[in-house]
Amino acid sequence: MPYIYTNLFLAFLTSLLGMLIYRSHLMSSLLCLEGMMLSMFIMTSLTILNLHFTLSNMIPIILLVFAACEAAVGLALLVMVSNTYGLDYVQNLNLLQC
C-alpha cells in the first residue's frame, strides 16, 4: 500500500514542478493545478478508506467542489485573456483592467 501513496506523492510533486517550470503560460499552469488537485483527491480518499474515518467522508467531495470552482474561474480567466490579447501569457494578467 505505501507504493500507492508514493506514486500519488510523486504525481503531486511532478505537477508542482510543472507549475514552477511552465508558470509563464496560463493553460499549463491550470493543467498542473488540476493534476495537483486530482492527486490530493485520490490521496485523501485512500487515506479515509484505509483508516476507516467515517465522519470525514465528505472531505474529498468538498475538495472536488473547490477544484471545480478553481477550474471554472481559471478557464473564464483564460478565455478573457486569450480573447483580449490572443495569447495565454500570465504576464498579460496585470494588464487586464476589470
Swiss-Prot record:
Any one GO biological process: ATP synthesis coupled electron transport
EC category: translocase
Record key words, sorted: Electron transport, Membrane, Mitochondrion, Mitochondrion inner membrane, NAD, Respiratory chain, Translocase, Transmembrane, Transmembrane helix, Transport, Ubiquinone
Reactions catalysed, as given in the entry: a ubiquinone + NADH + 5 H(+)(in) = a ubiquinol + NAD(+) + 4 H(+)(out)
Superkingdom as given in the UniProt entry: Eukaryota
Transmembrane segments: 1-21, 29-49, 61-81
Molecular function GO terms recorded: NADH dehydrogenase (ubiquinone) activity
Gene3D superfamilies xref list: 1.10.287.3510
EC identifiers of the protein: 7.1.1.2
InterPro entries in the record: NADH_UbQ_OxRdtase_chain4L/K, NUOK/Mnh_C1-like
Protein location: Mitochondrion inner membrane
Subunit annotation: Core subunit of respiratory chain NADH dehydrogenase (Complex I) which is composed of 45 different subunits.
Annotated function: Core subunit of the mitochondrial membrane respiratory chain NADH dehydrogenase (Complex I) which catalyzes electron transfer from NADH through the respiratory chain, using ubiquinone as an electron acceptor. Part of the enzyme membrane arm which is embedded in the lipid bilayer and involved in proton translocation.
Membership in a protein family: Belongs to the complex I subunit 4L family.
Protein known as: NADH-ubiquinone oxidoreductase chain 4L
Source species of the chain: Cephalopachus bancanus (Western tarsier)
